[in-house]
């Protein structure tokens, strides 16, 4: 059995920087046609020049791959700065509530403040797409749910602004995207295939720790059903986020799952298991093209076959290991060719 996926798109990707970028980028740039690149670096991408500099670093270390750049939402995003970004082809803003995830210490503290709303108004006028890490302070399993009032306010206040709920993780959020025409979402491999049991049901597995948390069986099943039917308001976004094993085994574990090396084989396995392979093309590419109005992307064909693939346990950077999701396991699908 074989399947060919055309122009795979990752609508949420972390490729880090410097040596780590060089070590992990190929896992995404080779099989994927394009990816929405996250701006929460150690020095956040808060303006056009730093974003373009980072884009150039990605382009120098890849080929036939389109990084779709995003700006880190901050008070310095004046109308003039947004216009400058737009002129350079930057179409995405990423809003991080302060302290909610990795490198979000510079995030937005007042989500409904006057400055935030002013920036969103300008973003709407210019046709930007708002991507949001939709969590609010509160009990860890309710953080996304607690952000619903903010999401509703955004959706109603800015009806022409496309708003993406990144890495949807709570089944209660599904009603929001079905209620509001301008609300969309991305889904990760880990949120549609894993639960809290994978993180802490046996021994604590730090390599399954991410934000937002993987949640209950009910959440996983409801989100998986969206993916399997390629819900038209949902696109695939891996949120692949590599960390060194030494950090993952420390007393203060950073959030992030490095899934990039297994994405296409694991998705094929999952969709085949549920008799939904015919919908994988829409989930992995077609929906994103429509939602984000993407065209002129590099042409890619990823051919996969139903042959065993033993997942490497890790990759190496600077003599340090980076653990790969499902490392050591055997997947039933294998990436055979990229053209």
UniProtKB/Swiss-Prot annotation:
The active site is at residue 239. The modification N6-carboxylysine is found at residue 94. GO terms for molecular function: dihydroorotase activity; zinc ion binding. PROSITE patterns: DIHYDROOROTASE_2. Transmembrane segments: none annotated. Belongs to the metallo-dependent hydrolases superfamily. DHOase family. Class II DHOase subfamily. This is Dihydroorotase. It comes from Helicobacter pylori (strain G27).
